[in-house]
Design a protein with these regions (language model features):
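Short, extreme N-terminal segment that most often corresponds to the first beta-strand
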Residues: 1-31
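Beta-strand-enriched cores of mature, soluble protein domains
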Residues: 4-7, 41-45, 90-91
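Short, surface-exposed beta-strand/loop "edge" segments at domain boundaries and coil↔beta transitions
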Residues: 14-17, 63-68, 95-101
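Ampiphathic alpha-helical segments that act as solvent-exposed interaction surfaces
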Residues: 24-25, 71-86, 123-132
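Short, intrinsically disordered low-complexity segments
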Residues: 30-76, 80, 85
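A short amphipathic beta-strand at an alpha->beta junction
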Residues: 84-97
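Acidic, proline/glycine-rich low-complexity IDRs
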Residues: 98-132
Length: 132
């Protein structure tokens, strides 16, 4: 089973926009909107509140699929386009040869994404499940 839980606050840049007038916030958000519109499996929720944009989604599949790959790729692409974005994507694939018993977290900040091991739920077989 593949499970993804993700959230991402979308911000055009992490730089002070007053000091960087070359950053076109409208273009950044238009690019994000176009990216989202092109998704084949658009199952994310976009929340606009208080002049902020927030994306959240979850995916639950029996196996790794095109949908899981597309959603991870979209998360990474938003981070590259809107470099001020930050968030977490929790990922578990119980068929993964290396990480079958642990959640991995894709941490997004300052235009980059980095995979990390989750310490709160991993190893799953000990921290959230018990088998005799």
């Amino acid at each position: 089973m593949v499970t993804i839980y993700a959230w991402l606050e979308i911000r055009a840049t992490y730089l002070d926009e007053d000091l960087h007038p070359e950053i076109d916030e409208k273009k950044v958000f238009d690019d994000i909107d176009n990216l989202i519109k092109k998704l084949k499996y658009n199952e994310l929720k976009v929340i606009e509140k208080n002049y902020s944009r927030f994306v959240q989604f979850s995916v639950m599949e029996n196996h790794k699929t095109e949908r899981t790959e597309e959603m991870i790729s979209m998360y990474e692409n938003i981070t590259k386009i809107a470099t001020g974005s930050y968030g977490l994507l929790y990922y578990l694939d119980d068929e993964d040869e290396v990480y079958s018993d642990e959640f991995r977290v894709l941490v997004s900040k300052k235009g980059k994404c980095e995979w990390k091991r989750d310490e709160n739920f991993s190893p799953c077989s000990i921290l959230i499940e018990e088998f005799d």
